[in-house]
Amino acid sequence: MEKLTDLNYTLSVITLMNSTLHTILEDPGMAYFPYIASVLTVLFTLHRASIPTMKIALKTSKCSYKVVKYCIVTIFNTLLKLAGYKEQITTKDEIEKQMDRVVKEMRRQFEMIDKLTTREIEQVELLKRIYDKLMVRATDGIDMTKEINQKNVKTLEEWKSGKNPYEPKEVTAAM
């Protein structure tokens, strides 16, 4: 990592590039010189900033390929933004992350739909049971023993003596 923070070296290289360009292009009518110089300055700065950054990242990280890919994609996206483009380069990892997010959201919605469908089915079954209980059913004969609480009433033939002991008897009283 030689000359990583050597500002004088960077400034001297920029000055050398500018003086070289001035000597090559001495024509005073050159209208595009400032643009060419600024593009070269940006490229040189990117070169000086990205090489040491990538070296440090490669040494400290375990997955060097992803770091290099991320750095290159970031550099290209920066250049595209400088050029005025709104589009960006995306990596497969970003696309996979977005796909995973979309699939997760779809699963969540499917689960919600399943829960709602189950609830609706339960409500329909409950309404059917309520309707069945409210339905008027025609019967042949009405069993009134339930209504007058006389389920265990014995008939005359069932009594031992043949008479109903609860039936009132004629009683004569002396006056």
UniProtKB/Swiss-Prot annotation:
BP GO terms, sorted: monoatomic ion transmembrane transport; symbiont-mediated activation of host autophagy; viral process
Residues bound to Ca(2+): E120, Q123
GO molecular function: channel activity; metal ion binding; toxin activity
Highest taxon in the source lineage: Viruses
Compartments where located: Host rough endoplasmic reticulum membrane; Host membrane, Host caveola; Secreted
Keywords annotated in UniProt: Activation of host autophagy by virus, Calcium, Enterotoxin, Glycoprotein, Host endoplasmic reticulum, Host membrane, Host-virus interaction, Ion channel, Ion transport, Membrane, Metal-binding, Secreted, Signal-anchor, Toxin, Transmembrane, Transmembrane helix, Transport, Viral ion channel, Virulence
Lumenal compartment spans: 1-28
GO annotations of cellular component type: extracellular region; host caveola; host cell rough endoplasmic reticulum membrane; membrane
PTM note: The N-glycosyl content is primarily Man(9)GlcNAc, with a small amount of Man(8)GlcNAc.
Metal-binding listed as a keyword: yes
Subcellular location, principal: host cell
UniProt subunit comment: Homotetramer. Interacts with the immature particle in the viroplasm. Interacts with host CAV1, early and late in infection. Interacts with host integrin ITGA1/ITGB1 heterodimer. Interacts with host integrin ITGA2/ITGB1 heterodimer. Interaction with microtubules blocks trafficking to the Golgi apparatus.
Domain notes: Binds 1 calcium ion per tetramer.
Protein name: Non-structural glycoprotein 4
Species per Swiss-Prot/TrEMBL record: Rotavirus A (strain RVA/Human/United Kingdom/A28/1987/G10P[X]) (RV-A)
